Amino acid sequence: MSILVYEVSKSLGNLKVLDRVSLYVRKVSLVALLGPSGSGKSSLLRIIAGLDSPDYGSVWLHGTDMTNTSTQYRHMAFVFQHYALFKNMTVYENISFGLRLRGFSYQKIRNKVNDLLDCLRISDIVSEYPGKLSGGQKQRVALARSLAIKSDFLLLDEPFGALDGELRRHLSKWLKRYLKDNGITTIMVTHDQKEAISMADEIVVLKQGRFLQQGRSKNLYDEPIDYFVGIFSGSFIEFPQLEESLDAPLGSSSSSSSSTKKSMEKDFTPFIPDLIWSQIFTNQSIHHYHFFLRPHELYLESQIDLKAIPVQIKKIIYKRTFVQLDLSITPSSWNITIPIGYQAFRKLNIQSFVQKLYIKPRNQVYLRAYPKKKNIISKQI
């Protein structure tokens, strides 16, 4: 059962909540909506669910225009941030409510509810009322209630937002497998990029009510359409900028800026083996762009390598699953942060901060270039 949203727009007064948003969700796939608060993600879910009407555009479910069709006929379940549990019903009664309405037998209801209670790790609260539950428990009860009726479509708004740690990772993996096994087409809103990458077949990025890019997580990570999508899908390492005016005539430069440029070209030689990129880096047009790499595209080693750039260790931060190295390339004042696994870190055999490391690009590098915009780096996202 596929979902097609075609040029949907929605305004609240003078505020444009959604601006001609289009997306397609293939049958039995999971699409994650990413974007900052206020980008229109939850509003889009409400329109797809039939809880709100668009000012313009249409919503198609499995090839049928359902834009003006009531929610109850859309064969759709949803879990929003306000869990809407029945306060006077126990956890068991909340989860079984939809099954009882559909006339399932007592034994089938019991088996289904108990299975979901076990999988979502809430068997211990089966007789409790919502008023006594934590936010994370309420979330899981609401999710279990939606999954119990096995709809064709499922809409999730931050389904694990109140959870963290190992439980959240476990439930994310379980839910992805459950949705595939039961043939449910799903759209999920999340602020957790790692969760979106691990769960979703495709990711959609929204900003200020506008569609920016849709694709597989690897495509968005490797080749984001702009800086915003790039930084939203993972960490960037920016190439340093030359100290030279953007308004300077082509070919004109001071002796100091010329020496800086030569130093920069020398430092970046390993990164620009391609002829086209070489021309960009030696051309005035470099001043009009920001250039970025992903941290994983860089390789660190402790042995002297004439084809690599020497770097100074500034700081070592030990995280739960990786080590963060803050490094500096002195001639060009290029400060970079590289996360590496503990096994790779041990191989570097770092003895002191005085020790130099050597960095170079891996075999395949996507050198991303985006036009400069005022305050593009410092802008809060």
Curated annotation (Swiss-Prot):
Main location: plastid
Cellular localization per UniProt: Plastid, Chloroplast
Matching SMART domains: AAA
SUPFAM superfamilies per record: P-loop containing nucleoside triphosphate hydrolases (SSF52540)
MF-aspect GO terms: ABC-type sulfate transporter activity; ABC-type thiosulfate transporter activity; ATP binding; ATP hydrolysis activity
EC number: 7.3.2.3
Domain (ABC transporter) ranges: 3-233
The UniProt record lists the keyword DNA damage: no
Catalysed reaction equations from the record: sulfate(out) + ATP + H2O = sulfate(in) + ADP + phosphate + H(+); thiosulfate(out) + ATP + H2O = thiosulfate(in) + ADP + phosphate + H(+)
Function text: Part of the ABC transporter complex involved in sulfate/thiosulfate import. Responsible for energy coupling to the transport system.
Name of the protein in question: Sulfate/thiosulfate import ATP-binding protein CysA
Gene: cysA
